[in-house]
Amino acid sequence: MGTESGSDPESSSNGWSRARGLVVKTLVLIGGALLIKRLTKSTTRRDHARVVSRSLTGEKFTREQASRDPDNYFNIRMLSCPAAEMVDGSEVLYLEQAFWRTPQKPFRQRLYMVKPCPKELKCDVEVSSYAIRDAEEYKNFCDRPKDQRPLPEEVIGDIGEHLTTIHLNCCDRGKRCLYEGSTSPGGFPNSWNGASYCTSDLAVLKNNEIHLWDRGFDENRNQVWGPKEGPYEFKPATSSSINENLSALNILYQSSIDKPIQGSLILQD
């Protein structure tokens, strides 16, 4: 009795299963690689702008730095919160700085506009600062209930003189910062304390820490205001700093004598 010629059906089935499994694995690997590539590319400049805006928002202090180097740095309270949104999606933040003992008396009030860098520029986020037309109306803006603040449309109408613009880029891997940047080399016009122009450096670190270095220079490039040793290091408020701040507020509100703070202010611009 002779044997039949041809392939074994079971062997053919196993071979096809292995081939199909190999194809599926290959497709999964390719799909995974494409997904990772897509996710990597999905972070847009607008996403970066949102991160920077969130990092700037909140209550921060330079308490640690002032304790470490009291001769060169004050303990400053910086408070910022969203105030409006422009038609193009740019976020407008209200920002004020005050000595930690007198948080209700800010010495600096600004509107910051945070938006993605224009396509023609090699940067990720653009941060511009503006004066406020009626700054008195905005004192302690972020501490007030929302129904007691100027309306968003009023905020936009109160955007005053353009002061500075900083272009931020994502920090290289291995650095402490997330974003860093500065004003253009020539800075921006400024006349405070004998200055002819000012510069500003900004770094956004992890945990919403902000390093800000504002300086003024005269026509001969001599620095006439601002810290010389390095930027102010603003760190998010801790429970202890909040308690100290509340104690300071209670003392000030109970006191009928308004004593001026001694010392030269190096943050004004």
Curated annotation (Swiss-Prot):
Induction: Transient strong induction in response to cabbage leaf curl virus (CaLCuV) infection at an early stage. Disruption phenotype: Abnormal organ morphology (e.g. pale green, reduced stature, crumpled and irregular margins in leaves and floral organs, and shorter roots) due to altered pattern of cell division and differentiation. Impaired plastid division leading to enlarged chloroplasts and the formation of cells lacking plastids. Reduced susceptibility to viral infection by cabbage leaf curl virus (CaLCuV). It is a single-pass membrane protein. Pfam families: CpeT. The chain crosses the membrane at residues 19-36. One of its GO terms (molecular function) is lyase activity. It is an enzyme of class 4 (lyase). Mostly expressed in shoot apices, to a lower extent, in leaves, inflorescence stems, buds and cotyledons, and, at low levels, in roots and siliques. One of its GO terms (biological process) is transport of virus in host, tissue to tissue. Its EC number is 4.-.-.-. It comes from the Eukaryota. GO terms for cellular component: chloroplast outer membrane; plastid. It is found in: Plastid, Chloroplast outer membrane. Keywords: Cell cycle, Cell division, Chloroplast, Developmental protein, Lyase, Membrane, Plant defense, Plastid, Plastid outer membrane, Transmembrane, Transmembrane helix. Belongs to the CpcT/CpeT biliprotein lyase family. Covalently attaches a chromophore to Cys residue(s) of phycobiliproteins. Required for plastid division, and involved in cell differentiation and regulation of the cell division plane. Maintenance of plastid homeostasis controls plant preconditioning to stress and stress acclimation. Confers sensitivity to cabbage leaf curl virus (CaLCuV), probably by supporting viral movement. This is Chromophore lyase CRL, chloroplastic. It comes from Arabidopsis thaliana (Mouse-ear cress). The lineage of its organism: Eukaryota, Viridiplantae, Streptophyta, Embryophyta, Tracheophyta. The gene is CRL.
